[in-house]
Amino acid sequence: MKKLLAVLTASALALSLAACSGAASSGSSAAASGSASQSEAASNSASAEGASYRIAIVQQMDHSSLDEIRAAIEAELDARAAADGITIEYQEFNGQNDATMLNQIGTQVVSDGYDAIIPIASLAAQCMVTAADGDIPVVYAAISDPATAGLTDLPNVTGTSDALNTAFIMDMMFAIDPDIQTVGLLYSNSEPNSETPIADAKAYLEEKGIAYVEATGNTTDEVLTAVSTLTDRVDAVFTPTDNVIMGAAGAVAETLTDAGISFYAGADSFVTSGAFATCGVNYTDLGSYTADMAVDALLSGEVPADYHVMDGGIITVNTETAAALDLSYNAFTNMVDNVVEVTTAAE
């Protein structure tokens, strides 16, 4: 199979997130593994054998969760091309979390005649949907709340959601420490992925009569300043699948752990960066499912109206952080079937 892989933004631009998973009302939920609709696409793949497709993979920024998703997308595109007897050429683009660059990438991808676009994360998806304007299938990956991000009820647009069950993560927090008095909510107010989870966290805490303190930042420097304001004011911190905060996750986790504060987050990439715990989806499964959706759309000529909510159910704990905080996490084994232990990844 022929494959085109460019680990640059693009030559023209090189210079210039049931148990843990949420449920979105406008999406559809199914198992985390397997093809989006391979059984329906089987007859289409037979008739499409020998066809060639070009797919643009547009990653919002570099961090471990998005990197894992991209790698899984590429692996599944390779696998589907071999299985279906087709050629899939794909090219990577990276917007460096910059809307201007992402818009430029969108313009280039459309003008270059790609057959489909797979944007990873909210800002990338929004920019690609605008650029495609309904003319090219856009199959997004890892959007926590597609409705809030303005990615529903649009022609030729679908994808996967890693929607959080914020209440469950709050339950985890209080299962470990029932005496928590104040919770810090650390997020970027420019990140669509954070809007619904933060609102849900506030509602949960208000119902329990627990105080909360908000801290926000839209750049790495702002995030580090924001977290420093929490260290003497809160007992635990929650961050959703926020790509901006993830960009500084290692420094945030270190600051909070040094202050004796447990850090709960919306993705396992935070935990491998030093946060204490999360509960969410498997991002390799999410990437594979997204790739299947894109290939099935190309083979069938039809883009599903509903997005797909990935199943969660996996608690991930950083054992080094647990030891540093002197926390036992035995309570988690009563909450889910699968508790994964990790350590902090080397930078």
Which ranges hold each PLM region?
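Structural motif
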Residues: T87-S111, T216-L230
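Hinge/cleft segment of the Venus flytrap/periplasmic-binding protein
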Residues: D296-E347
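Hydrophobic alpha-helical segments within soluble ligand-binding/sensing domains
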Residues: E49, P146-T152, T158-T182, V281-E302
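Periplasmic-binding protein-like
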Residues: A56-V58, V109-S122, V139, V183-L185, ...
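Flexible loop/hinge segments that line or gate small-molecule binding clefts
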Residues: C127, A131-T166, A265-A277
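An alpha-beta-alpha
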Residues: I55, I73, D162-L205, D306-A323
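Bacterial lipoprotein signal-peptidase II cleavage site
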Residues: A19-S39
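Extracytoplasmic "Venus flytrap"
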Residues: A48-A75, R80, Q91-T100, S190, ...
